[in-house]
From Swiss-Prot:
GO molecular function annotation: pyridoxal phosphate binding; transaminase activity; UDP-4-amino-4-deoxy-L-arabinose aminotransferase
Modified residues (N6-(pyridoxal phosphate)lysine): 182
Protein name: UDP-4-amino-4-deoxy-L-arabinose--oxoglutarate aminotransferase
The gene coding this protein: arnB
Annotated EC: 2.6.1.87
Protein function: Catalyzes the conversion of UDP-4-keto-arabinose (UDP-Ara4O) to UDP-4-amino-4-deoxy-L-arabinose (UDP-L-Ara4N). The modified arabinose is attached to lipid A and is required for resistance to polymyxin and cationic antimicrobial peptides.
Catalysed reactions listed for this entry: UDP-4-amino-4-deoxy-beta-L-arabinose + 2-oxoglutarate = UDP-beta-L-threo-pentopyranos-4-ulose + L-glutamate
Keyword Lipid biosynthesis attributed: yes
Pathway(s): Nucleotide-sugar biosynthesis; UDP-4-deoxy-4-formamido-beta-L-arabinose biosynthesis; UDP-4-deoxy-4-formamido-beta-L-arabinose from UDP-alpha-D-glucuronate: step 2/3; Bacterial outer membrane biogenesis; lipopolysaccharide biosynthesis
Length: 384
């Protein structure tokens, strides 16, 4: 019997294991030289001015919003078609999330929809680079500049993504994730990249108790006057155990993303005969990181609902995922915004299915998934 094929699995090898062992043997396992290495490498590779490692992208989003002064009475525009953590952070800061619709085929936010949602209370715009593709930053930056509203890019899916001739994170402010299923991982972790000196300084303070320096700096500098609380902050620093994994993964990113791209090309060929609807690619020049490979399962076309198809895949030993259930359709937000209607988001939320995609997949795994989908859809279309 074939083993279960998960929808994701981290590409952890001997280099990462040895890096962790070296940290454990070094005597310094919390925030230290590996964090510094990760931040330095990230800036060198992607051209960012500042890189601040944190314990998760959610933590990075929280303190970035806080650093921008977001609070009660403010509004933040963002899509509902995203992971719920962004909107949770807006609400927990006492601000109001203004959820907008996305393009039906790419899941990217529409610049016109964002501009239409701007009010005098709008204090930030958070677009999402979805599944590894970038949103249209030129249009969004023009809106940001025209209205004087900060743009914070949710780049959790976009490590190694390019928009036109720029890396995501090279310009502006972007927040990355190193969660277990991301293109590079350290189990849990994230990073804030920004070209804003003042914002970078405040994010760095807020991630570690509001101190002007982190633990590693304090050891080097002793009990210097600067090692004092400048403002109340959080404990969102990343340990060197985690950072060491991320340093190795970042070095391996080109091979990791190249393998993802090859697997997706195989998927497109293998699934071409099926009535599944993969996401469309943005029309502008870009480099896709292929964090996720998603299809839309429309019952009228496929003879089976998304949820039924996912259950059938599971019965056949194949994992799948849902990225994501629209935020405004979930209990807390559904009750808070009962009249919010986002047609494209809702259509996709009911049909999205993420198929297995990770660097260590075999070519035969793609064939296995395609054969399973062919069997499932074939049997249901016949019986309908």
């Amino acid at each position: 019997m074939q083993s279960f094929l998960p929808f994701s699995r981290p590409a952890i090898g001997s280099e990462e294991i040895n890096a962790v062992a070296n940290v454990l043997g070094s005597g310094w396992i919390t925030t230290g030289p590996q964090n510094h290495q990760l931040e330095t490498d990230f800036c060198q590779i992607f051209g960012c001015k500042h890189a601040i490692a944190v314990c998760s992208a959610t933590a990075g989003m929280h303190i970035t919003l806080l650093a921008l002064g977001i609070g009660p009475g403010d509004e933040v525009i963002t899509p509902s078609q995203t992971w719920v953590s962004t909107i949770n952070m807006i609400v927990l800061l006492g601000a109001e999330p203004v959820m907008v619709d996305v393009d039906r085929d790419t899941l990217m936010v529409n610049a016109a929809a964002i501009e239409a949602a701007i009010t005098p209370n709008t204090k930030a715009i958070i677009p999402v680079h979805y599944a590894g593709a970038p949103c249209d930053l030129d249009a969004l930056r023009q809106i940001s500049q025209r209205h004087g509203i900060p743009l914070i890019e949710d780049a959790a899916h976009a490590v190694g993504t390019r928009y036109r001739d720029q890396w995501i994170g090279e310009q502006g402010t972007a927040i990355f994730s190193f969660h277990a299923i991301k293109n590079i991982t350290c189990a849990e972790g994230g990073l804030v990249a920004t070209d804003d000196d003042e914002l970078a300084a405040r994010v760095r303070r807020l991630k570690f108790h509001g101190l002007g320096v982190d633990a590693f700096d304090r050891q080097i500098q002793g009990r210097s006057p600067q090692a004092e609380v400048v403002e109340p902050g959080y404990k969102y620093n990343l340990s060197d155990i985690h950072a060491a994994i991320a340093v190795v993964q970042l070095r391996r990113l080109p091979e990791i993303n190249a393998r993802r791209q090859a697997l997706v090309a195989s998927y497109h060929k293998a699934l071409a005969h099926l009535p599944l609807q993969p996401l469309a690619l943005p029309h502008y020049s870009h480099q896709h990181a292929w964090h996720l490979f998603m299809v839309r399962v429309d019952e009228e076309r496929c003879g089976i609902s998304r949820d039924q198809l996912m259950a059938c895949l599971k019965d056949m030993g194949i994992g799948s995922g849902l990225h994501f259930r629209a935020v405004h359709s979930q209990k807390y937000y559904r009750e808070r915004y009962p009249h919010l209607c986002l047609p494209n988001t809702e259509w996709n939320s009911a049909r999205l299915c993420t198929l297995p995609l990770f660097p260590d997949m075999l070519d035969s795994d793609i064939e296995r998934v395609a054969n399973a989908l062919t069997t499932i859809i074939g049997s249901h279309r016949v019986t309908k």
